[in-house]
From Swiss-Prot:
Protein name according to UniProt: Outer-membrane lipoprotein LolB
Cross-referenced InterPro entries: LolA/LolB/LppX (IPR029046), OM_lipoprot_LolB (IPR004565)
Organism: Pseudomonas fluorescens (strain Pf0-1)
BP terms from Gene Ontology: lipoprotein localization to outer membrane; protein transport
Subcellular location: Cell outer membrane
Entries under SUPFAM superfamilies matching the protein: Prokaryotic lipoproteins and lipoprotein localization factors
Signal peptide stretch: 1-17
Gene name in the database record: lolB
């Protein structure tokens, strides 16, 4: 059961990248589209961070929560999970082409991509690689999205690839307005992410 939760939590193990403002986005809401484009460009340059927080999941047969540490350095990530689901700890590391999941007292699992790891272990097809974008308050660039902006021209809601993402609060850190609380609603599970501390960094191209 713990491994099942860990794989779901591995949504967070993702790759940073680049995105432009384009026709794949449908923008509505109270914000200013031009200001959103500027905000998006600013956030897209953020390619490194350290996050400490909590994550929870609710599925038809499973629910639970745990603590989260997420280190991102451009295309490399190091995700560590512990807490009530832990019975030990889990660590997910990877970069393009190689993802590794280590679970205390259970073993090591590998796959070429986070999506492949989730499908292999759970049989679920999920947009895993979107999470590095969503956690920054950005839509993923490789598929269509519908955005609702708040009065500050930041994401309030995002619909993408069958997922609804709610941005409940933001905080300013080192010149970036970043999400503090996010809820993700999929067809058969809900994920809640509460970020206690953000340490954003722009590492370069």
């Amino acid at each position: 059961m713990f491994l099942r939760h860990v794989i779901v939590f591995s949504f967070i193990a993702l790759l940073a990248g680049c995105a432009g403002f384009g026709a794949r986005e449908s923008v509505e809401g109270h914000g200013n589209p031009a200001q959103w484009a500027a905000n998006k460009q600013h956030l897209t340059g953020l390619d490194g961070w350290q996050i400490d927080g909590k994550i929870g999941i609710r599925a038809p047969k499973d629910s639970g929560s745990g603590t989260l540490f997420w280190l991102q350095r451009q295309d490399y990530y190091d995700i560590r999970l512990s807490g009530p689901l832990g019975r030990g700890a889990a660590r997910l590391t990877g970069r393009p082409g190689a993802v590794s999941l280590e679970v205390a007292n259970q073993g090591r699992y590998e796959a070429p991509t986070p999506e492949a790891l989730v499908e292999e272990q759970l049989g679920w097809k999920l947009p895993v690689s979107h999470l590095a974008w969503w956690v920054r308050g950005l839509p993923a660039p490789d598929s269509k999205s519908r955005l609702t902006l708040d009065g500050n021209s930041r994401l309030a809601n995002l619909d993408q690839d069958g997922w609804q993402v709610e941005y409940l609060s933001y905080a300013e850190q080192n010149g970036y307005w970043l999400p503090e609380r996010i809820k993700l609603h999929g067809s058969d599970l809900d994920v809640t992410l509460v970020i206690k501390t953000w340490q954003p960094r722009k590492l370069g191209q």
